[in-house]
Design a protein with these regions (language model features):
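Signal-transmission linkers at sensory-effector interfaces
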Residues: 1-18, 153-158
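Amphipathic alpha-helical regulatory segments at dimerization interfaces
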Residues: 8-12, 21-30, 71, 96, ...
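GAF sensory/regulatory domain recognition
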Residues: 25-31, 35-72
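Regulatory sensory and allosteric helical modules in signal-transduction proteins
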Residues: 56-98, 106
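A short, aliphatic-rich beta-strand micro-motif
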Residues: 103-111
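Sensory-domain boundary capping and coupling elements
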Residues: 110-126
Length: 158
């Protein structure tokens, strides 16, 4: 997984935003991830999806709320091994999980100039939940961070 994430990071750093989608598809394929959504701040509209969602993820405004962001750790990672665990507190997010048969998810909040600009979500479909191991989390985090860094450079040039 270290070799995979390193190769994908190099691909992003060398190819820029033009290869970001290709890199995400390869990451998903090699790590058996079924779906990926990017929510763009501040509206948290679905900006990009990869995978086969039964229902378009739509807007998840609560993802930008301080209360929800407090669920993320110091590295801006939110591990959801069982999506039912957030049903009571965040029914809108849980409804998205339920409609798309998502059992487990991994979310990364990305900052640009200290402000939230996107949340990347990686999903596992089906009843078999995935307990995310640290190696998986680290590999995915590295690739997301590389894409965010390249996006920041791209954004600053405009």
């Amino acid at each position: 997984k270290v070799e995979l994430s390193t190769n994908l990071m190099l691909k992003v750093f060398n190819g820029g935003m033009d290869v970001a989608e290709e890199v995400l598809v390869e990451l998903m394929d090699k790590m058996n991830i079924h779906g990926m959504t990017i929510y763009k701040a501040p509206s948290m509209e679905c900006w990009k999806t990869l995978g086969h969602y039964e229902k378009e993820p739509g807007t998840q405004l609560c993802l930008s709320e301080e209360k929800y962001l407090a669920r993320f750790d110091e590295h801006h990672i939110h591990v959801i091994n069982n999506t039912a665990s957030i049903a009571v507190e965040y029914p809108q997010v849980y409804e998205h999980f339920k409609q798309n048969n998502i059992g487990s998810a991994l979310q990364f909040s990305c900052l640009l100039n200290g402000q939230l600009w996107a949340v990347f979500e990686f999903d596992i479909f089906g009843a078999n939940r995935r307990k995310w191991c640290q190696d998986d989390i680290s590999a995915i985090y590295s690739v997301v961070k590389a894409i965010a860094d390249v996006y920041k450079k791209f954004y600053e040039q405009k």
